[in-house]
């Protein structure tokens, strides 16, 4: 993103903003004014709830799963701990990094590995056959997430943290 909104200066975005952008795209580019359903997982579930509240005439039904209409304190803390893991890397440099903060991105990935997959998933070792051990499964996740942009991840987390469909 060009200055003045580059790096950590990108403006705050709300789930409501995402829904409005999607609605405008659907209408302007595809001529779609009504959706059969909005299906969403996690932050996508938040968007589904927002569609129902903001544009009830434009969506027949919603199928939100693994998400809430409001981010509660536990979710806010979980997100804050992921951000702390990422920003603890000195290379992060308050978001003005010149190279990816690799150890921070790795910490972010490992944090999410504990949340994205359930205790039961890890206990039953469902990471197999893709990985032969927990360490290998974590290494694969870190590698998969390595190209992600740290400031983008934080912007997404902040969007998630602030969401309350009732606001």
What is the predicted role of each segment?
Residues 5, 16-37, 46, 50, ...:
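Conserved acidic catalytic loop of the alpha/beta-hydrolase fold
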Residues 42-44:
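Short, glycine/acidic-rich beta->alpha junctions
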Residues 38-40, 65:
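Short beta-strand immediately N-terminal to the catalytic nucleophile in serine-hydrolase-like folds
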Residues 21-25, 111, 152:
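Amphipathic alpha-helical segments that form well-ordered structural scaffolds
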